[in-house]
């Protein structure tokens, strides 16, 4: 509203100022060459720039070094950065992995690429041997014959086990004391003689059958029937009174009559 009232008021008079040329003619403003203004502006600009941003201190010139694979440290050591840590010594000695790269004389020339460090993979024979399972002699199946891949029939026939003299001697000693083995004792003998439990079990079964045959003992699995010739003898021995009656009846009747007369 105030601005509109000023614009609508017709009595407002615009101030009139003389042009700049009159100021220069009346020597209000001294005349200077354009070089003067340029020099002052540049000097003032530099002066303010120096006050706001002081110049950085001069950097010391150090010889440039190119680090190669020799600067690599072990897992327990830390890398050395800058000249401050150059004099620090670690107790562990770092072993260089490859040859250091040559230092370049000029900084403008491109630095050569560091050589590739070819570190061979360490071999651990102990770890490889530990992964392989240990197979004991008693775990090997020596009593099973080799299987033919072209054989399409049933289970291959087992070959006969050939016991050594030492094995047979130990088995005979055990059979002399115990004809029947427990499971625990069978496992102990199998481990000591490098045989399987099945082999020990079968050997003792065969040895018991042989012992019964040598001592002429009847087989407990089959019942023995009485022989046919022994039946009449047993019957005659069981009934002795019947034979006496039969002999008395065989006497003649005349003798019986004579005995009756004498009794009268």
UniProtKB/Swiss-Prot annotation:
InterPro entries: Antp_homeobox_Deformed_sf, HD, HD_metazoa, Homeobox_antennapedia, Homeobox_Antennapedia_CS, Homeobox_CS, Homeodomain-like_sf. Its main location: nucleus. One of its GO terms (molecular function) is RNA polymerase II cis-regulatory region sequence-specific DNA binding. CDD domains: homeodomain. A motif (Antp-type hexapeptide) lies at residues 135-140. Sequence-specific transcription factor which is part of a developmental regulatory system that provides cells with specific positional identities on the anterior-posterior axis. This is Homeobox protein Hox-C4.
